[in-house]
Regions:
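Structured catalytic cores of enzymes that bind and process phosphorylated ligands/cofactors
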Residues: 6, 50, 54, 109-110, ...
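Conserved PLP-anchoring active-site segment centered on the Schiff-base-forming lysine
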Residues: 70-88
């Protein structure tokens, strides 16, 4: 059975497995002090910008949490459709790790519009309200 619900549900592309097998032949220092990480960082900087700082994580939840942590502080709120992956499928990890409030918005089709969000955009500068900061969009 094929499932696209998570990146954890399938095997890797044969080229990825081939690269893993090549890397598995010898010993390497861990925690980013190895030639494989150095090569990956160089390729990422070449592709995007020399100033970027790649942060490697092992799954989608980790990448979502890191991205949200970089954009928010604990007094912020994150808006998303009520069907959004970060609200439905990540077991509270984004809330726990960011300290932010996730504000799910009811939608007829999982798509947010300015009109649907309008009633949530209040409390700016009010210390008694979490401050709107991020909008999570998923397919």
């Amino acid at each position: 059975m094929r499932s696209f619900a998570s990146d954890n549900n399938s095997g890797v592309h044969p080229l990825v497995m081939e690269a893993l097998n090549r890397a598995n032949i010898d010993h390497s220092l861990g925690y980013g002090d190895d030639k494989w990480t150095e090569e990956a960082v160089a390729k990422i900087k070449e592709t995007f910008t020399p100033n970027c700082v790649p942060l490697f994580v092992f799954n989608g939840t980790g990448s979502n949490v890191v991205a949200l942590q970089l954009m928010t502080r604990p007094y912020h709120s994150i808006f998303c459709a009520e069907t959004a992956h970060i609200y439905v499928d990540e077991c509270g990890s984004p809330v726990k790790m960011t300290g932010c409030q996730i504000r799910p918005i009811a939608t007829p089709d999982g798509k947010l519009t300015p009109e649907l969000m309008q009633s949530y955009l209040h409390g700016f500068g009010d210390q008694h309200h979490s401050q709107p900061r991020a909008l999570y969009i998923s397919q």
